[in-house]
Curated annotation (Swiss-Prot):
PROSITE patterns: GW
Family per similarity comment: In the N-terminal section; belongs to the N-acetylmuramoyl-L-alanine amidase 2 family. In the C-terminal section; belongs to the glycosyl hydrolase 73 family.
Protein name as catalogued: Bifunctional autolysin
Annotated GO biological process: cell wall organization; peptidoglycan catabolic process
GO cellular component: extracellular region
Function: Endohydrolysis of the di-N-acetylchitobiosyl unit in high-mannose glycopeptides and glycoproteins containing the -[(Man)5(GlcNAc)2]-Asn structure. One N-acetyl-D-glucosamine residue remains attached to the protein; the rest of the oligosaccharide is released intact. Cleaves the peptidoglycan connecting the daughter cells at the end of the cell division cycle, resulting in the separation of the two newly divided cells. Acts as an autolysin in penicillin-induced lysis.
EC number of this enzyme: 3.5.1.28, 3.2.1.96
Source species: Staphylococcus aureus (strain MRSA252)
Molecular-function GO term, any one: N-acetylmuramoyl-L-alanine amidase activity
Skewed-composition ranges (Low complexity): 173-208, 419-440
Region (Endo-beta-N-acetylglucosaminidase): 777-1257
One matching Pfam family: GW
Amino acid sequence: MAKKFNYKLPSMVALTLVGSAVTAHQVQAAETTQDQTTNKNVLDSNKVKATTEQAKAEVKNPTQNISGTQVYQDPAIVQPKAANKTGNAQVNQKVDTTQVNGDTRATQSTTSNNAKPVTKSTNTTAPKTNNNVTSAGYSLVDDEDDNSENQINPELIKSAAKPAALETQYKAAAPKATPVAPKAKTEATPKVTTFSASAQPRSAAAAPKTSLPKYKPQVNSSINDYIRKNNLKAPKIEEDYTSYFPKYAYRNGVGRPEGIVVHDTANDRSTINGEISYMKNNYQNAFVHAFVDGDRIIETAPTDYLSWGVGAVGNPRFINVEIVHTHDYASFARSMNNYADYAATQLQYYGLKPDSAEYDGNGTVWTHYAVSKYLGGTDHADPHGYLRSHNYSYDQLYDLINEKYLIKMGKVAPWGTQSTTTPTTPSKPSTPSKPSTPSTGKLTVAANNGVAQIKPTNSGLYTTVYDKTGKATNEVQKTFAVSKTATLGNQKFYLVQDYNSGNKFGWVKEGDVVYNTAKSPVNVNQSYSIKPGTKLYTVPWGTSKQVAGSVSGSGNQTFKASKQQQIDKSIYLYGSVNGKSGWVSKAYLVDTAKPTPTPTPKPSTPTTNNKLTVSSLNGVAQINAKNNGLFTTVYDKTGKPTKEVQKTFAVTKEASLGGNKFYLVKDYNSPTLIGWVKQGDVIYNNAKSPVNVMQTYTVKPGTKLYSVPWGTYKQEAGAVSGTGNQTFKATKQQQIDKSIYLYGTVNGKSGWISKAYLAVPAAPKKAVAQPKTAVKAYAVTKPQTTQTVSKIAQVKPNNTGIRASVYEKTAKNGAKYADRTFYVTKERAHGNETYVLLNNTSHNIPLGWFNVKDLNVQNLGKEVKTTQKYTVNRSNNGLSMVPWGTKNQVILTGNNIAQGTFNATKQVSVGKDVYLYGTINNRTGWVNSKDLTAPTAVKPTTSAAKDYNYTYVIKNGNGYYYVTPNSDTAKYSLKAFNEQPFAVVKEQVINGQTWYYGKLSNGKLAWIKSTDLAKELIKYNQIGMTLNQVAQIQAGLQYKPQVQRVPGKWTDANFNDVKHAMDTKRLAQDPALKYQFLRLDQPQNISIDKINQFLKGKGVLENQGAAFNKAAQMYGINEVYLISHALLETGNGTSQLAKGADVVNNKVVTNSNTKYHNVFGIAAYDNDPLREGIKYAKQAGWDTVSKAIVGGAKFIGNSYVKAGQNTLYKMRWNPAHPGTHQYATDVDWANINAKIIKGYYDKIGEVGKYFDIPQYK
């Protein structure tokens, strides 16, 4: 039975006639786009918004720019003491199927729940007295309860922690006959590790014998036996997070999933990188937590937050993980092992036990099919079909997950060991003999909001709390933030991180630090007096190693505080004094009383009672989030609110007026003035003038570049890509306070980086002296700077390769550039060699540096516009992508263009040759002028302009539109109108060239050549699979495609039925069936008059052409699709819902003065469609039919057309991911609706303009 959501779907997802198709109505979550605009559980939303566009540029290389590799440490290598075992616990957990409101893709709910992170701990420790005395002479005692809310950072690199051991109850693969008791809530056991790119997985110590029992498989599985026999190991878990993915809490809060869902990608030809890249480009529709194949586990979203992978009901509950298809026995076995290991790790980490939900809808391990069956909100049935194709089953996979979990929990013997005894559960803990490995005991982890200083004598930093020894550290006697507390057995650890950046250092033992509780910082706006010489610190409770500066001047100075934090019982304030900023204990500050202002009459001119002084200044400042606004003049009484906060600006002037001090801030990179700000509203630093430098450094991947020195997160210009240290070429340097910032370029990205993140590369070895030659003399005299040039080059077949920088010692393979022509924009001498920078054929994108010895180079002249027709010679070199192009860059061969007419639009000189750019055979490119012959002059002929009504599509963005035909001066580029409709009203032929006069999409009238127009625009996209392959996938689905061989009787379609229905070549040749490829997200600018003629006699929709036209343009929807939707929903405009009514006292009133209309059936639920539909229309304010058309179109567009599947064919067959997210089961669904749309086009007197046709291999 179809499930309703927000809107009563027509039974064809807009078009299908009653009884003509079976439609899947519940397309949510992984199937539809979630409204993110009002969700209050989004974390770091400002930063996400600011970095989205920059992050998207990295999508095509999904796992290259990983700053670190996540390592799951297997705690199974640490054998637990028998005393730590508990009795068997039969704990049943019942999944709550109640729909929970929250912005988790549930389309019926608009309420957002503000879930907050929950700090959890299972151990209670007694208060500890701290007898350490600071240099300030007061004692810091840790005896105060801190009840402030802690913001927990859940994205620590994960390591399989070791929670309390509990027996796992294996559920048989059969429905339960007895009621299931409610499941006990278990405390999540956080993953205990730090960010560490160098962390390595532990190697299990050789343990030929163990006292643990061997696991007894619950199902027979040759693949699982193969995995066990070969003792397959799971790979390191890689993190490839994307900053612009939304972060929403689960329904129980951040870091509290209730289980894991098994998916498969349903794409037999894709790879793990391809799946991730596709997901990142289409994350608005769906994204998951991780992908697994036979070689890799890549986590793509933090598991502490929900993903959009399993529908509106399942998304706020479960972790979603996709299995990428593999094609041989060994690879499939490895992928199952990898999935089971990842799933067991997640269950262990979050304190969940394996519990299959497949047969009763209750548990922690689900398939997508089980979610569809028991919870709803989705209709997928994976991964059963894929598993069956490898003679495997979900039951076998679950058995492997269960075994992995028990191994990790130390309940059964690891693979590769021999079990000697089968221990019984003691009624009382006994004292075992000394184990061969250390006992771990119970692990508890809790969030912490404190600070700590590492003592000079310590045990080192630990990557995980399971490590036997720590690594030596120099980070002693400094104050760090503490974000986590962990207790393992009798040991207690703190996770310490840099106070200001959040960079994690590692775990330290409790006895190795001086610890203090800390409350969260709060913003303040208070002035104090401070004595000269008082130290400022970079952190509160800072040490001598963290001094930011000293207060200068004579006599008491003014310290303007902007932030305050309580450390134990002491108060520290952050602020500025004389251009320096830092933290000071409140004990060193004296509160200054605010002067009482004396009322004065309002002057007609700015007051001059107070002395004004203005001086030039060279500094930088960041405006605090809390401020008094921007002042146009320092005489203004109040400032204007500003959003330019927490950004770095240049300061050019300083002004004092009475007791107030102001800074004049401007954009750092342009002359744009922002305004005056009060001194107390900024964090200010002195700055020296920038100086030019020419220096090379190395920088680590992931390092941020900023658009300004001392930039903030709002001014990120990018991040360093690549693996291993990269070369940063600095060209400018500026000192901000005592820090040095350098501006330069790395891997094509430019920006500012603190010198602290740069390293000077080791000096290269001196080369053996060579005798002087003419080449060397040239190299010595050539300036060592980059020159801008205009040249063109062909890469030789045998070349030394391409470099990202001339400083790279080793070039990358340049074979793919060989025997091709590229533009040259830069030239630089380096040592004895000369290099040039090659750009792609569009001039825009630099490819890399080549040695000139590897190129044939010619000078390139300026492009000149021309308008001339030529005849192509019988013997010619063809049409090329680039002037002086090679055989590898030919668009049309010489035979294809010989004796043809070439319409040139511009020309350029290459050395002594001239190349012309133009059009021939509907293709554009370059031809050598030697291959062309200019036609003999003929007498101009001009026909009279005649009326001609037709809507074309502009197909040549490189063409022009004209004020008058054949005008050489009054012409303008068509680039902005490419692929847009052009409504023609007149036709004229001049000198054999047909011209059309009509209206552009912006309403402007113009002349365009017929060669730049097309009656329809057809695009083809390659699928990558054969028709047989995709048809086999569709025919093999658990829910088979349907066909009516006898009217009214549905049966399963066979392979031939499906293949016939999916054959795009056949469909594209049929004038009606072709319309299933019509793009429904592209309006055609059909005239309002034509629409009104078609709507004549269509009830309240009559004469609503203007409304449909407006709706189509506003929301990007094909007009005919929108009209057909409305006609079917309203019974050709005659339904009461369309004619309008009101709802008064929850009753429908049809004779009210004000009526509300609903022409698309939105929210017209089946139980009472008229009342519900009118209520929705009233809430939306649709008190006219035109408002209902325009307002309803927005919903139609967002719910269907804009969801990614923008043609009827894509809606039915989803060729990009066959067998998934399909809107119907009837094999004839797209055909039926294509005929309906074609019929409407015929009645309107138009044809479809935009088609998107898939092509199979």
